[in-house]
């Protein structure tokens, strides 16, 4: 297969010899915005992240295989892929561990008032905090019970939480005390102390967390979004945030987040630059997924 590999796979060059022994022919594109090093018609398979944001997929007349380095499919014109029966794989499970750790970190940061302690340290201020919360015994709702959501569930269970799942395709799973469909989300929000969003962005999930659903959240509850920014209606969130215990946002409707956005300066908001997926084990896991899919193909 004629493979175009982009710099989205950091360890790609370590495997070129292996690919060639399997009969694949390789062209490499470091930056996906740049011109291709080969004709579009030459390409039969791609390993990429956002290649089709910069190069129309219709130009790849002989494309039959796509391997993404991302967990989501939202940067690919999936209707075209399905119509042309192109085989496609994502990086399922690659980023689940660091993202789950990040979600847990964010909740603990808010419960244990990490911001306050850090600010006091910079001022050499010895001041006890009397309103720290325990994670033990809290009810956590994971919205999106795929690999990322389930890794989150495992970690919250270890801390003694009750974990409830909400998913597009509810099922029985040992990591959740129950799992319901999205149609039950509004009722479930009433009883949960922590809500973690890990589901994909689709037409159905766009602005899933809107004004009416925020109104259903418990006073003092925490929202974590490590999924996609557009799942949350940002303006509605800003309005309700004073009533919440806090919010952990790693993704936003517009990235980078504008310097003028009030979220930067809200005391109970943790704002991070789409960073939750980063971990020192990603490279090994991603290479394993890519190689397994190619071997099976």
What is each of the regions a protein language model found here?
Residues 170-262:
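Rossmann-like adenosine-cofactor binding region
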Residues 7-9, 92, 133-157:
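Glycine-rich adenosine-cofactor-binding loop
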Residues 89-102, 116-117, 255-297:
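C-terminal helix-to-coil terminal segments
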Residues 86, 91-139:
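Phosphate-binding beta-alpha-beta segment of Rossmann-like dinucleotide-binding domains, i.e.
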Residues 1-87:
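An N-terminal-biased, well-structured beta-alpha scaffold segment characteristic
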Residues 2, 25, 139, 161-162:
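Residues at the starts of beta-strands that form the adenosine-phosphate
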């Amino acid at each position: 297969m004629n493979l175009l590999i982009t710099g989205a796979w950091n360890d790609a060059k370590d495997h070129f010899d292996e690919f060639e022994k399997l009969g694949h022919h390789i062209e490499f594109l470091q930056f996906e915005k740049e011109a291709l090093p080969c004709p579009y018609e030459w390409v039969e398979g791609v390993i990429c992240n956002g290649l089709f944001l910069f190069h129309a997929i219709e130009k790849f007349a002989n494309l039959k295989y796509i391997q993404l380095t991302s967990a989501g499919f939202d940067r690919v014109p999936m209707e075209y892929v399905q119509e042309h029966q192109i085989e496609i794989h994502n990086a399922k499970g690659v980023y689940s561990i660091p993202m789950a750790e990040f979600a847990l970190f964010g909740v603990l940061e808010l419960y244990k008032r990490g911001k306050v302690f850090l600010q006091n340290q910079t001022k050499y201020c010895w001041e006890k905090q009397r309103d720290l919360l325990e994670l033990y015994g809290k009810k956590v709702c994971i919205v999106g019970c795929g690999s990322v959501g389930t890794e989150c569930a495992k970690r919250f269970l270890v801390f003694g939480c009750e974990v409830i799942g909400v998913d597009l395709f509810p099922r029985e799973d040992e990591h959740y005390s129950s799992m319901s469909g999205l149609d039950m989300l509004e009722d479930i929000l009433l009883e949960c102390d922590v809500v973690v969003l890990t589901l994909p962005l689709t037409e159905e999930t766009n602005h899933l967390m809107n004004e009416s659903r925020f109104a259903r959240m418990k006073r003092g509850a925490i929202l974590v979004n490590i999924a996609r920014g557009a799942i949350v209606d940002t303006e509605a969130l800003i309005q309700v945030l004073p009533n919440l215990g806090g919010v952990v946002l790693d993704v936003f409707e517009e990235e980078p987040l504008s310097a003028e956005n009030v979220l930067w300066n809200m005391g109970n908001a943790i704002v991070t630059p789409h960073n939750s997926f980063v971990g020192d084990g990603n490279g090994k896991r991603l290479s394993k997924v890519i190689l397994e899919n190619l071997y099976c193909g």
